[in-house]
Amino acid sequence: MKTERVNVNVNNQPYPIYIGENLLQDKSLLQRHVKGRQVMIVSNETIAAFYLDPLKAIYQDFQCDTFILPDGEQYKTLEYWEHILHKLASCNHHRDTTLIALGGGVVGDITGFAAACYQRGVDFIQVPTTLLAQVDASIGGKTAVNHPVGKNLIGAFHQPKAVIIDLNTLNTLPEREFKAGMAEIVKAALIKDEKFFTDLENKMSDLLQRNFIFLQAVIKRAAEIKRDIVNADEKERSGERALLNLGHTFAHAIERLLGYGQWLHGEAVSAGLVLAAQLSHRKNLLDFESLQRICRLLTQISLPIHFPKSINADELLSAMYMDKKVANERLHLILLEDLGHAVVSDQVDDRELKSFLENG
């Protein structure tokens, strides 16, 4: 399989996304984006058991330190972020060090935030090992940790030096996490590319069988969609990048109310996508057939299309206001005018939203 490359260029800071097989064995590739002689690999207990030793071997001629997190969203906290910084300082890492995030979205987010803050900013490389991280979390430079009040409330924009996607890491990904990652691919299609959405409908059976040929193509397309949006609006100033939050205001509220880690992020995103589509239909933006197609595709993937019965409308609405997509005390929701065409809207007031959440 030929390795595919997607080039990102944010504020004249270009970096590549590589997508292929056996990339974790490519010494030249993995050393190419390290400018100094120090690296620290951050991973979690689950991923480290599979991939840490081979990656450490690549850097055997470097000062190579490691920090291993427990596995789970509940550990994406200021406490563990501080532990990473302490390890960097205690091992005497300098400004030319490089952090390597080996893992899923939690590892990538907390490692990137540590890199953004250590000595006012050092390099880091994303090596995402979950489908969700490969198509979304590793791309675009958003780094953060969670706070009891809300998800990703504390963080920074800090672009990686490279994103290295080894498809072989998907062989060890549990089925539930693999399917959760599909939610972000569906989201990318809904935002910008109706043809891509149709392709997903036609190829989903092969994708769920982890066919690498098809997976490489859809990961590349999802990465291109995010690349184009991030290049145009790195820090959500123009509103373009806000489109990537389709379904996420609902999703983040669901995650917080259930307790981080009870639902995977992609599972909450799936329910959020359906809520956004249903609200779009209610406001006469999205036709019923398109809404049905979204629900059918997510159901085929075995992802949730309803938010949990244990959460009531008042709780969900209150939690949504702790999201970052609030401006001038109004929720800015991402809605769909069509498959492949998302828009930012502040035209949903609390009364309408509460009625929608209570009655659908």
From Swiss-Prot:
**Enzyme Commission number, as recorded:** 4.2.3.4
Q: Where does Zn(2+) bind?
A: E184, H248, H265
Q: Which Pfam families match?
A: DHQ_synthase, DHQS_C
Q: How is the cofactor bound?
A: Binds 1 divalent metal cation per subunit. Can use either Co(2+) or Zn(2+).
Q: Which reactions does this protein catalyse? A: 7-phospho-2-dehydro-3-deoxy-D-arabino-heptonate = 3-dehydroquinate + phosphate
Ordered alphabetically, the record's keywords are:
Amino-acid biosynthesis, Aromatic amino acid biosynthesis, Cobalt, Cytoplasm, Lyase, Metal-binding, NAD, Nucleotide-binding, Zinc
Residues holding NAD(+): 71-76, 105-109, 129-130, 142, 151, 169-172
**UniProt cross-references to CDD domains, sorted A to Z:** DHQS (cd08195)
For whether the record's keyword set contains Cytoplasm, the answer is yes
Q: What class of enzyme is it?
A: lyase
State whether keyword Lyase applies: yes
Under the heading InterPro entries, the entry gives:
Dehydroquinate_synthase (IPR050071), DHQ_synth_AroB (IPR016037), DHQ_synth_fam (IPR030963), DHQS/DOIS_N (IPR030960), DHQS_C (IPR056179)
Fetch the SUPFAM superfamilies from UniProt: Dehydroquinate synthase-like (SSF56796)
Name its cellular compartments.
Answer: Cytoplasm
* The protein's annotated pathway: Metabolic intermediate biosynthesis; chorismate biosynthesis; chorismate from D-erythrose 4-phosphate and phosphoenolpyruvate: step 2/7
What are its GO cellular component terms? Answer: cytoplasm
Single GO molecular function: nucleotide binding
Chief location? cytoplasm
PANTHER family from the UniProt entry: 3-DEHYDROQUINATE SYNTHASE (PTHR43622), 3-DEHYDROQUINATE SYNTHASE, CHLOROPLASTIC (PTHR43622:SF7)
Q: Which family does it belong to?
A: Belongs to the sugar phosphate cyclases superfamily. Dehydroquinate synthase family.
Task: Give the function comment from the record.
Answer: Catalyzes the conversion of 3-deoxy-D-arabino-heptulosonate 7-phosphate (DAHP) to dehydroquinate (DHQ).
Query: What name has this protein been given in UniProt?
Result: 3-dehydroquinate synthase
